[in-house]
């Protein structure tokens, strides 16, 4: 059964993932990535422009589909070897502000989960946000 997920990641890190065709969540932990399966969908929510910045964004910034079931490590620095998964991202999307998500009836359930960094959402919520992100 296909599942739908949200990952909470700063926009600059989302862009790296989209450009490289991969995802990372929860500061590179493998457990959350293993919960997703081939064919599952991921929305990225970016609270900020960059991890080390105070500049807020508060928007959904990318959407993609898990390509396979492989979770692997990748050395980004000698002391940072995070886990990743390969993702096929949708390229014809634009950021969707959090105000749009607040209009969905499930938002109150999901708003409190943003602090966890990765969580499952309903198909209906995913499609609501994804449709708002799609470029005409």
Swiss-Prot record:
Gene3D superfamilies tied to this protein: ph1033 like domains (3.10.590.10)
InterPro entries: EVE_domain, PUA-like_sf, UPF0310
Cross-referenced Pfam families: EVE (PF01878)
Family that this chain belongs to: Belongs to the UPF0310 family.
Protein name per Swiss-Prot or TrEMBL: UPF0310 protein SMU_442
